[in-house]
Amino acid sequence: MRILKLAALSCLLFIAPSLSINCDGLSKDQCEQNFPQCQILTAKSCCGESKSYCAERDSNDCLASKISCKKDPQGNIYEFWSSCTPSSGFTDFIPSNATCSSLNCNAQQMSCKYVQQACHETSCCPDIPQCQIPATGGGPATGSATGQGTSGGTPGSCDKVNCPNGYICTIVNQLAVCVSPSSSSSSSSSTTGSHTTTGGSTTGSHTTTGGSTTGSHTTTGGSTTGSHTTTGGSTTGSHTTTGGSTTGPTCGNVNCPRGYHCEVRGSQAVCVADEFDSCANVDCGSGYHCKNGECIRDKVECDACDQINCPKGHHCISQPKGGWIGSHKKRHWQLHPEHCGGRPNKIKVICVPSPKGTCKTVQCPKGYKCKLYADGPTCVKIEKPKCLTCKDMHCESNGLLCVLTPQKKTDEECCPIIPICINPSTIAASTIATTTASTRHSTASTIASLVTGTTSGGGGMGSFGGRSDEESSDPNAILGLFEDDIFWGDNDEYFSDNYRYVDEEDIDEDFNGNDEFEIDVEGDFQEDDFEEEYAFY
């Protein structure tokens, strides 16, 4: 006996390793054969190539949408969106998280542009921001500065010039120029031209911002207050004022760095930063747009299931608005993110086992309908709706009348008639109907009173939908009133058991067109009879 036990134990130890499956490296067919221990998943490369791999299912059934990036031996970068990733064959990869804000290109007098990588299909390969020198635009021009002061003039001075942080003021050919400390005077911004002042008194400002300006500014005698401003581009011309002497700070001797312009504030000429549009110099490239200086991926509406090829015997379903239910999580085969629009951060679609059979070949009994489940088609009971009644409408308390209107849609899940409130003044002639009913457990009866009145034409409500009084006096004509026209009701309750079919025999034989008529409602209502004439209350 002891020998048999030892033999059995040895056998178990021998076969135990074979029970543990290494999912890594298994082919797609092998992985499917070892489901649910192994799970077939896909990763997407930056160039849009989908790659299938087999992974061991974790405690979350691979549902945790943990985005990670890995690189294969060939240098291809893949995005993995599941918590189940290969344990070999890939190395971790951290994508760049640089932004235009982090580069701070403006401080370097440069603009920022997002450069799209050659392959950019996933979040592992975002566009890379780069500082670039604008091809055109304002800013200091290179060259030399020349100028002269004549009688009564004041040469350029840095005494009353405030430069932005990171810049210092220096005199270049009698011009106050804000330059970087590392820049030399010879490479400072310049303006080619002349500035001449003769006598008199002139108070004003002459501002030149960016670009290359060629021309002259001459003031002769008199007293003039004014300003002259040239912004950006290339300007050729002159500005002449005849007046007296020149006193006080002016922007004529100040050349501000790129992104700034000169303003006279009090007793000082100050370089002030230009109003900056954070997206003005940001080029995000295709599929992105700029917002507050940042490039944001464009939102693209799409059906994620269009991108998925499910295994044989499975089909793709999109995530419902209420989220995934337990049966979906347990019975799924493949999980996929939504790779259109924003970065995938949730599981949007899954592949689930396809149901067996079809509802096309199933005929359910009355009161039931066919629904297709994973185990096959099932007849489920139709839940009848809670239909409103005139009692729910409270029309009378608001000075209105309640009418019951039959609906053309005859599904059991829909209310066949609905109550509405109308203004009595909208009723032509004088058509009044009263409806009474007993309790749900007793025989119901409907009493309808028709008081005929004079009608003009054929469009009045007084003759039930435009019928003449002559037509309305015919019992057979009355039968057709309830399907297409308004049926009148009061505060009586109606539902299921109170729906009855109106037979021609139910109408009293002694009915005449001028008196009240009575309809005894006894026949059971059948759905197949819905298209025939019947009354509801």
UniProtKB/Swiss-Prot annotation:
InterPro entries: Dict_spore_N, Fol_N. Glycans are attached at N97. Residues 1-20 form the signal peptide. Residues 183-246 are annotated as: Disordered. Residues 21-140 form the DSCP-N domain. GO terms for cellular component: glycoprotein complex; spore wall. The keyword Signal applies. Phosphorylated and fucosylated. It comes from the Eukaryota. Pfam families: Dicty_spore_N. GO terms for biological process: slug development involved in sorocarp development; spore wall assembly; sporulation resulting in formation of a cellular spore. The keyword Glycoprotein applies. Keywords: Glycoprotein, Phosphoprotein, Repeat, Signal, Sporulation. Residues 157-179, 250-272, 278-296, 358-380, 389-415 form the Follistatin-like domain. GO terms for molecular function: DNA binding. This is Spore coat protein SP70. It comes from Dictyostelium discoideum (Social amoeba). The gene is cotB.
